[in-house]
Amino acid sequence: MEYKSSPKRPYLLRAYYDWLVDNSFTPYLVVDATYLGVNVPVEYVKDGQIVLNLSASATGNLQLTNDFIQFNARFKGVSRELYIPMGAALAIYARENGDGVMFEPEEIYDELNIEPDTEQPTGFYEAVDKPKKREEKKKTKSVSHLRIVD
């Protein structure tokens, strides 16, 4: 019987994050911006990746869960809410000396990065604020059944 363990990535990410912060390093996160569900400022994406500063001074409401990383950050003075599924986290390292870790591929994250067969909103924002427009029925002119009587 094969034992299925939970993914290592969230635990390693949190451990390295804590170690970097405890040693006064600036934690940088490398993100696969093409991964399904990623919400980052696309104007800063380069070669499908973005590097994000996770320091306390650069982020607000930072959450490092087993499934995702979420926080607020400012880009050119504009506040943005970022959402990174754990499968999109590629590496975490210190800005000052590059010390850190690249995460090994894990099968579960490959499975989660597959587009669903049916089109569904990816989040509450899309479902509520950007509803799909209903296709309007095209009105066709029909010949009137009325006629002019003299």
Curated annotation (Swiss-Prot):
InterPro entries: SspB, SspB-like_sf. Gene3D superfamilies: SspB-like. Transmembrane segments: none annotated. Residues 114-150 are annotated as: Disordered. It comes from the Bacteria. GO terms for cellular component: cytosol; ribosome. GO terms for biological process: positive regulation of protein catabolic process. Enhances recognition of ssrA-tagged proteins by the ClpX-ClpP protease; the ssrA degradation tag (AANDENYALAA) is added trans-translationally to proteins that are stalled on the ribosome, freeing the ribosome and targeting stalled peptides for degradation. SspB activates the ATPase activity of ClpX. Seems to act in concert with SspA in the regulation of several proteins during exponential and stationary-phase growth. Also stimulates degradation of the N-terminus of RseA (residues 1-108, alone or in complex with sigma-E) by ClpX-ClpP in a non-ssrA-mediated fashion. NCBIfam families: PRK11798.1-2, PRK11798.2-5. This is Stringent starvation protein B homolog. It comes from Haemophilus influenzae (strain ATCC 51907 / DSM 11121 / KW20 / Rd).
